[in-house]
Design a protein with these regions (language model features):
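Glycine- and acidic-residue-biased ligand/ion/polar-headgroup-sensing regions
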Residues: 4, 14-26, 31
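Conserved short histidine dyad/triad with adjacent acidic residue
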Residues: 1-12, 47
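Short acidic-glycine-tyrosine-enriched beta hairpin
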Residues: 32-48
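Double-stranded beta-helix
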Residues: 52-116
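Hydrophobic/aromatic beta-strand elements that line small-molecule binding cavities or substrate pockets
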Residues: 18, 41, 51-53
Length: 117
């Protein structure tokens, strides 16, 4: 889900992803090319594509069901994901009470004792 006026961090990964848009309207930037989407459509992110997701509405959230092949890449030890531009630390235009996360779990490469369990 992307809040009104929200966006994801700019990133890339080796696995593809499919986004079935449940509600709202927005767009993606894939390697510098814009692709618009709305409810009922599917957005495809191809392998090795630097991309970012945007909610085009200033008043309504955008929601999507995301389908990825990431587990297969993890199983084959071929997962590579890289953040190109970090998540925004400022509120989206309509979300004045936004508080950024102070910490974020990295479930791909855990560093605590749970990883050894």
């Amino acid at each position: 889900e992307y809040s009104p006026g929200g966006k994801s961090h700019k990133h890339g990964h080796v696995n593809e992803a499919a986004f079935y848009i449940l509600d709202g309207a927005g767009y993606e930037i894939h390697d510098g090319i814009r692709y618009d989407w709305k409810a009922g459509q599917v957005a495809i992110v191809p392998n090795n594509c630097v991309h970012q997701h945007f909610n085009a509405s200033e008043t309504k959230p955008a929601r999507a069901l995301v389908i990825k092949t990431k587990p297969m890449y993890m199983f084959m030890n071929m997962l590579f994901q890289h953040t190109v531009e970090k998540r925004p630390k400022t509120p989206s235009p309509t979300q004045g009470n936004f508080v950024p996360r102070q910490e974020e779990e990295d479930y791909n490469y855990p560093t605590d004792e749970k990883a050894d369990a």
